[in-house]
Structure formats: C-alpha cells, structure tokens
C-alpha cells in the first residue's frame, strides 16, 4: 500500500494552513516522508463544507471525520475513519474499497496515555503506552517486547506556540513487522496527534 516494508524510520509532518496562525482550527493535513525527506505519501482530512468547519470548532477531536491516505502517485489507498465519541476515542483503518485493516482504540489509564492497535477482527496486535516521564514518546509492544515507537518532535518555538503543527518520528524497530502492522503504526501516529496534541473543543 505504502512503501513501508523496508523502512526503519518514517516522518509524519503536519502541514499548517494560514488560519492556524490566528488560532482558527483548520483541517488536518500531513506529509509522510522517509528519513531523507523523500515523500512516501500524504494524508488529508476530508473537508465537509461549512458544517464540517463549525463542528471542528465546537467538537474538536470528538467529531466524526475521515482522513484519506495517499501514496506517492497521489492515489487514495487507505481511509482512516473516526466515529463520534466523547470517551475512548477510536480510529478505524480500511482500504479505499472499504475492507477493514484494523483500528486504534484508546484504553483507560490513570497516569499515562494508553491505547491498543487491533487487527481487522478486533484482536489486539500491539499495546501502546506513553511513560509519564516521556510524554512525547509512545512505545508499541508485542508480547512484552518493544517493536515500534512514535515520538513527537519539536516543531519550533513559534509553531508550537501558535499552531497545532506537529512532527512525528515513526520508528519500526522490529524488521519482522508485517506490512499491515506498519500501516497501523503509521495510522497510530495520526491518532496520537488528533487525540493528544490537537487543541480540544472550546479552547
């Protein structure tokens, strides 16, 4: 689907729009690049006109939305669907034909961020947590062994202060990760940004 199988590191870079500089929330768009800055694809939230814009301002990351993921040839290959939820957010990943690949499911936790990566049958493939002493680091574990990691990178003082522009390093630490698992880890980076770093409704 995306050229991820032979990659050790992938960067997900959020692209900001003018409205973000004045505190006005705009749709999410991301570049997906390798560690040399070569584009592997991109992802973009689908705008739903004026109603979508209003819901974004009122509901933030609780709202229903779709993110389309494209390959290097700008062909839509995946869709990440976020259903409306106030609690325990979820991101469902499927092919453009509608075949489910898996999901990212938030779990209850007191002092740290926690979610699971599920396969198409709802079975847990990877467990993910962010240590309380590393709030920008998310470790992906399979059977008590770390196999991947997503880390939020510093975007610069001005961008951090005035916009939601976030950059993430996705590290595939286990060469045995399947193509499906790599796609889900990449999708989890989008989930992390939307859930933990996007401005919440009303702010």
Predicted regions and their residues:
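Low-complexity or membrane-interfacial segments used for flexible interactions
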Residues: 1-66, 70-77, 82-90, 96-101, ...
């Amino acid at each position: 689907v995306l050229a991820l199988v032979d990659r050790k590191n992938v960067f997900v870079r959020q692209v900001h729009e003018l409205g973000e500089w004045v505190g006005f929330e705009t749709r999410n768009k991301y570049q997906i690049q390798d560690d040399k800055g070569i584009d592997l694809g991109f992802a973009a939230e689908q705008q739903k006109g004026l109603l979508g814009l209003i819901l974004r301002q009122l509901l933030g990351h609780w709202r229903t939305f779709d993110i389309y993921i494209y390959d290097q040839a700008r062909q839509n290959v995946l869709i990440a669907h976020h259903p409306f939820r106030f609690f325990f957010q979820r991101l469902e990943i499927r092919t453009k034909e509608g075949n489910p690949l898996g999901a990212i499911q938030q779990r209850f936790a007191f002092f740290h961020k926690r979610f699971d990566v599920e396969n198409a049958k709802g079975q847990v493939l990877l467990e993910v947590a962010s240590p309380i002493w590393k709030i920008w680091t998310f470790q992906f574990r399979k059977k008590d062994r770390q196999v991947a990691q997503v880390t939020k990178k510093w975007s610069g003082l001005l961008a951090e202060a005035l916009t939601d522009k976030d950059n993430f390093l996705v590290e595939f630490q286990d060469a045995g990760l399947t193509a499906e698992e790599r796609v889900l880890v990449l999708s989890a980076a989008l989930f992390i940004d939307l859930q933990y770093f996007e401005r919440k409704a009303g702010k």
